């Protein structure tokens, strides 16, 4: 399978992607990681309004193969939760970067997206040459 690695995304070591938009961070899980999980059957996300610290779990993704936790790459308040993914887990599998985003985070402090991997760096980590 060939994966998409859009240039406007940055990635955490734990496969979450971050898209910075107007001071907010849209967070989801990379196509690569979702493909590794297989068929997604259940998604649970933290509540809107939750304040969490960097590295804390903000959700769980359950597939036929495994149950994986997803982690916040930055501290802040979850200002939006993608309920469509909770109601329709296949959205996460079919379009993880588009309709399958998970949460929108309002960072607690100014964040440095450059602390995360660029798309190119992430791609070289997960796709053998």
Swiss-Prot record:
Lipoyl-binding domain location: 24-106
N6-lipoyllysine: residues bearing it: 65
PROSITE patterns: BIOTINYL_LIPOYL, LIPOYL
SUPFAM superfamilies in the record: Single hybrid motif
Keywords: Lipoyl
Signal peptide: none
GO cellular component entries: cytosol; glycine cleavage complex
GO BP terms, alphabetized: glycine decarboxylation via glycine cleavage system
Family: Belongs to the GcvH family.
Function description: The glycine cleavage system catalyzes the degradation of glycine. The H protein shuttles the methylamine group of glycine from the P protein to the T protein.
Subunit architecture: The glycine cleavage system is composed of four proteins: P, T, L and H.
Protein name: Glycine cleavage system H protein
Native source species: Prochlorococcus marinus (strain MIT 9215)
């Amino acid at each position: 399978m060939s994966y998409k690695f859009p240039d406007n995304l940055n990635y955490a070591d734990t496969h979450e992607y971050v898209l910075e938009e107007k001071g907010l961070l849209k967070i989801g899980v990379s196509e690569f990681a979702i493909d590794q999980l297989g068929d997604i059957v259940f998604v649970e996300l933290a509540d809107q309004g939750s304040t969490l610290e960097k590295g804390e779990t903000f959700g769980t993704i359950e597939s036929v193969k495994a149950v994986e936790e997803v982690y916040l790459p930055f501290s802040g308040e979850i200002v939006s939760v993608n309920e469509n993914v909770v109601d329709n887990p296949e959205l996460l599998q079919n379009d993880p970067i588009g309709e399958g985003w998970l949460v929108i985070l309002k960072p607690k402090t100014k964040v440095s997206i450059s602390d995360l991997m660029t798309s190119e760096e992430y791609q070289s980590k997960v796709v053998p040459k």
